[in-house]
């Protein structure tokens, strides 16, 4: 496989250099946080492999690696909820990606919510761990 990304030579180059040198984990994945370009709201968390990151950069449409299906997928391929990239950032260690995307009037979550984080976990004393009820988050908006 020919890499389009620079080899990670030293920490100074990774943290302060001008070249993309993403660090994929032992499974060949890098975590991705995706937010709404218009609102800044958190939409989802996913993973990319080398091919998904490359395709996302080249096409401006988000591609993820599905850990459950073990295959590359273009967001919206089945649901129609496409994510168009407005900006890509990488953290200081280059081991985590942040996507800022346009989802139009669509959803991000495959079950139809704008955000995959549509449920809220209550804070305070836990009475029964097996029956801790989760509530509706303030961002709960179904498309």
Per-range role (PLM):
Residues 2-27:
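Short, basic/aromatic recognition patches
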Residues 50-66:
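A short, polar/charged loop-to-alpha-helix boundary motif
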Residues 128, 132:
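Conserved active-site carboxylates
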Residues 133-143:
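Residue-level detector of conserved catalytic or cofactor/ligand-binding positions
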Residues 20-49:
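Short beta-strand segments
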Residues 37-39, 50-53, 94, 104-106:
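Short, charged/polar surface micro-motifs in flexible loops or helix N-caps
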Residues 62-122, 126-127:
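Short, structured beta-strand-loop surface elements
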Residues 15-20, 61, 68-69:
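Glycine-rich, flexible loop/turn motifs
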């Amino acid at each position: 496989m020919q890499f389009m990304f620079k080899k990670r030579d030293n920490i100074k180059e990774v943290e302060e250099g001008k070249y993309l040198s993403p660090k994929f984990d032992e499974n060949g994945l890098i975590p991705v946080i995706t937010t709404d370009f218009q609102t800044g709201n958190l939409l989802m968390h996913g993973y990319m492999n080398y091919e998904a990151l490359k395709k996302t950069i080249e096409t401006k449409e988000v591609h993820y690696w599905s850990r459950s299906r073990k295959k590359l997928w273009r967001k919206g391929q089945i649901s129609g909820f496409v994510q168009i990239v407005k900006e890509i950032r990488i953290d200081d260690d280059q081991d985590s990606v942040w996507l800022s995307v346009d989802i139009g009037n669509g959803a991000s979550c495959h079950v139809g919510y704008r955000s995959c984080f549509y449920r809220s976990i209550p804070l305070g004393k836990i009475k029964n761990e097996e029956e801790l009820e989760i509530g509706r988050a303030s961002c709960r908006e179904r498309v």
